Amino acid sequence: MSTVEPNVYDPHQVETSAQQFWDATRAFQVDENSEKPKFYCLSMLPYPSGALHMGHVRNYTISDVVSRYKRMTGHNVLQPMGWDAFGLPAENAAIKNKTAPAKWTYANIAHMRAQLKSLGYAIDWSREFATCTPDYYVHEQRMFTRLMRKGLAYRRNAVVNWDPIDQTVLANEQVIDGRGWRSGAVVEKREIPQWFLRITDYAQELLDGLDQLDGWPDSVKTMQRNWIGRSEGLEIQFDVRDTNGAALDPLRVFTTRPDTLMGVTFVSIAAEHPLALHAAKSNPELAALLETLKHGGVSEAELETQEKRGMAIGLTAVHPISGEQVPVWVANFVLMGYGTGAVMAVPGHDQRDFEFANKYGLPIVQVVKLREPRNDDEQRWDATEWRDWYTDKSRELELINSAEFDGLDFGGAFEALAERFERKGQGQRRVNYRLRDWGVSRQRYWGCPIPVIYCPKCGAVPVPEDQLPVVLPENVEFAGTGSPIKTEPTWRQTTCPDCGGPAERETDTFDTFMESSWYVARYTSPNAREMVDRRANYWMPADLYVGGIEHAILHLMYFRFYHKLMRDARLVDSDEPVTNLLTQGMVIADTFYRDADNGGKDWINPADVEIQRDERGRVTGAVLIADGQPVHIGGTEKMSKSKNNGVDPQSMVAKYGADTVRLFSMFAAPPEQSLEWNEAGVDGMARFMRRLWAQVHKHVGEGAAVALDVAALSAEQKAIRRKTHETIGKVSDDYGRRHSFNTAIAAVMELSNALAKFDDASDQGRAVRQEALEAMVLLLNPITPHASHALWQVLGRGETLLENVAFPQADVSALVRDALTLAVQINGKLRGTIDVAADAAREQIEALAQAEPNAAKFLDGLSVRKIIIVPGKIVNIVAG
């Protein structure tokens, strides 16, 4: 036990003592040999950027609070930690600092590990790993070669978003206003060979599995459903003719609105479609347009808002029913990566087609009307003015201008057309998914090498398992242009495992989402020879996963998919990796930047900026401390490494102590809401910690408490004890069911305030106070474990791991009141209150209510007709 002056809270001494005890006893190291129910709780693993920010602290404190609470409620709890260590930021730092990415990464891991340990998290550090080590990534290389052999990993050319500065492929979500999200460079479209995983083979299972994830937020499940994007429709064939009438390869289009087929007036294809590329060979104007469209937006938001552009390519498509020839156009809102890269254009009933047709003077035909228009506006159809009902499939519709299909509704038209096309071999029913196969190739150096060898004779050959891992060379010269392993002949050149001839290694590396898609399972058996061993089935699925909702689509989708791959490889038994998901809100803070030479922004940490504020605390100006020159104000944004606006938790821990920082991060907002960093709020939490420390020491300094004798308690003593057990019940519910940590803290603060007003130095008064203080220490232990560890000893309970002490249980008998205060109403209006014994008879309550002085005045001259008693709350006298 540390020696601390009474009433003086020294967080650093307290925290050092507690952490030394936990380390010496290996307090949080767990195994599978326990009769306790298991609870696997973790947060999304951090990228070792160099320093934690308060968003990390909030994330990891949430999982730590739950983990410690579960330990105290009798669970065998696993809370691990590791490092998502590959990725582009390490390369950028290597360029900036003239150091190898590996050296930079490992140094950051050491620093951030120390930061995490200073915060006192109950982590099993024996399971720690970094995803950039061969011991880790060998397993995903082995899995990839097995997926290749099963046909679930394949290589094909794909049109990608190419960042010419970072020299890599970007996901659609990483392209912002046509520029790379990190470099700010104008993004190009290129067709290059890429490796893919067939996530689309699992699309329906991924969709169906969402119905089983009752512990996931509905918002996340909705985003995943929309991303998977299941739609039922028809795939229809359009024959194609050139300018001479000669037949070319037909186009196949997928549509969910076959009822509008007779409204097709042209067919749109993507700029990368083979027909467009073929036509451009003899059409310089078209070729120039296709080159321009390479720089167009690719995200759905950009496709919706960007100006519609296109050109007829000189070919026609034959309408499969009318036989009419309609022109084929290139359109910038059609993407080769979605569907077949061709769509039937129905400008009368699709808004993008409508805008395109009006711009280029193409025909617009109405083929659907509302059966029951609600107003005059819905009775009119105007080819120059778009109305939402034109495409509203949820309304009762009827086909017009559609030959023999006139009068049919959507369902009738769908069935009639499906039967016709299937009979004639012109189409078929099809379920389509918006989800695309996962492109896992990245043209970067700092990533897991893709285990493939290219042989002129044998083609793409998976590296044999006995030659794995393919180790990424770490001591490289890194100039920042492309990947150094592409120009490293001793690494790149090898022999073919099949024929023994000269061959070359794949120089692309895996998308870093690969590493984060299976790490949760690896924690269960970090030293297993295979990817995981039997221990995985003890711990998996994880019981609680904590992370930001920004990961709802990419990480959490790949995470679920990869777990199913592992299940099908008989590595795990469970269908899903996690049963409960908590998506914490952002921690936000001010941002500042200067314009970069490349058109992007150089973000500056707020600690390096002198800020001017108005009387309301709003930022009005800022200068860089180093040179005194102005910087731009970027507004309040999520704390992140990309915006460089993180607060270093180490400085906060140094100033206030870890428990105070943890307490503020849990108190300032509910977990799901954004938390605005406010140091004044941290000061408030520090004052509470000092007050709690003083309360305990004052009580103990007055002598030992006697045993509690419930039967001997006074009314005031019973009231304090009742408050204690009400608090226990509320905090238990807030921790265990609601994850409402801010209200749990508020409840303990209320108990502390009540105890401060309880001035009873009698033996039983001190016994009640002892019980309340012990309860407060245990209730706060999941959030302020260091102080709780020390105060438990001060209260005379000895040095022990509080996680092995049972969480307090509310004594139901203590919640029973001896006396109750009831509201007295006359005809539903409040007229007074009465105090009655908890076991008072009905007749006594009625008499007291009628005798209440103010109520008696309102009853004067009236006859009491009925008295309604709501037990413990209200007496309502009905009189007239």
Swiss-Prot record:
Any matching Pfam family: tRNA-synt_1_2
Reactions catalysed according to its record: tRNA(Leu) + L-leucine + ATP = L-leucyl-tRNA(Leu) + AMP + diphosphate
Residue ranges of the region described as Disordered: 483-502
Superkingdom of the source species: Bacteria
An example molecular function term from Gene Ontology annotations: leucine-tRNA ligase activity
EC number: 6.1.1.4
Keyword Nucleotide-binding: yes
Predominant cellular place of this UniProt entry's protein: cytoplasm
Cellular location(s): Cytoplasm
Motif position, 'HIGH' region: 46-56
Renumbered ranges of motif 'KMSKS' region: 638-642
A biological process term (GO) from this entry: leucyl-tRNA aminoacylation
Residues where ATP binds: 641
GO cellular-component term (any): cytosol
Keywords from the UniProt entry: Aminoacyl-tRNA synthetase, ATP-binding, Cytoplasm, Ligase, Nucleotide-binding, Protein biosynthesis
This protein's record includes keyword Cytoplasm: yes
Gene3D superfamilies xref list: 2.20.28.290, 3.10.20.590, HUPs, Isoleucyl-tRNA Synthetase, Domain 1, Valyl/Leucyl/Isoleucyl-tRNA synthetase, editing domain
Family: Belongs to the class-I aminoacyl-tRNA synthetase family.
Record-given protein name: Leucine--tRNA ligase
Organism: Xanthomonas oryzae pv. oryzae (strain PXO99A)
Species lineage: Bacteria, Pseudomonadati, Pseudomonadota, Gammaproteobacteria, Lysobacterales
